[in-house]
């Protein structure tokens, strides 16, 4: 579009349309003294525009059975809706209005701040959730990627209309956003004035590899919880295309080690065989310029050392010898099946469609992803394991 907005549409015969805006504006884009501002702006975007009240925004789609929602990550903010196809135009108009014309009225801030502060306190009461952010704060210390997305209650209470307008005028621009739509026969006209000038896409503050994981080692925090919560992890791969082979190898390896299947190596070793944990899982997070692989587990405080030894033993196996062809093929089959089932969740598929287009300028292609998984070899898995699971690169955080 002349204004710089990118749009992607995947038609569907379904009577429901999923659509929205993905904006490259997350907590990593916050400047000094702005921690939590991206999430604050997400909340306040629903509180009024130049021509809509908060009540009108709330009721606009719900009156016809639709839904309106949003979320903030470290790299983007997403506003999205689901509506019967007949009301697609209504949803497009509303989403465009709140994203590009919100006024963030001061009279609404006082009420919404209390909602956000309750969200922060609720999050702080959940160590199984909090430890993930605390871990990234250690890993990315000194960089906005290390900030908690929600911010602190003290900081959030200080935000004003001027703060929200300053942040969104810098980042909520057509050239920094993608409009996505899954469903319907054709992409509707998006009501952004032609006078809106296209601007170059914003460049993020890149992280140099030398600055990653300077805090490698063990950190213990006394949380006074009944159960111990443990995170360990190391740097991994960013979204760069020249790391595609490594990223897909780690994607498969992560699913084998601690993916969502009950047959994951760590779940079988720690839970099924020994009954040491209720939850153990691993994950890989891919940012534009860096990445993170980590494992989380919850166990009795007296079992922490034993659990860590068992995790280390499993990681060493992948470093020491390649997977057999039978196990590798079984792992690929499982992951391909999971991806296929994921595609049946239409809302999540729509959100992924927008996310991939925002950051990679291409449509989501599950068939291509499955082919990339099939191309991974046992030697690829072992090479990536030796790189990611190197003990000297590991950071460990323990809540007791």
Model-derived features: where do they sit?
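His/Glu-rich zincin catalytic helix
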Residues: 1-56, 165-269, 308-312, 393-400
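Charge-rich, well-structured scaffold segments of protease-associated domains
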Residues: 54-204, 220, 236, 258, ...
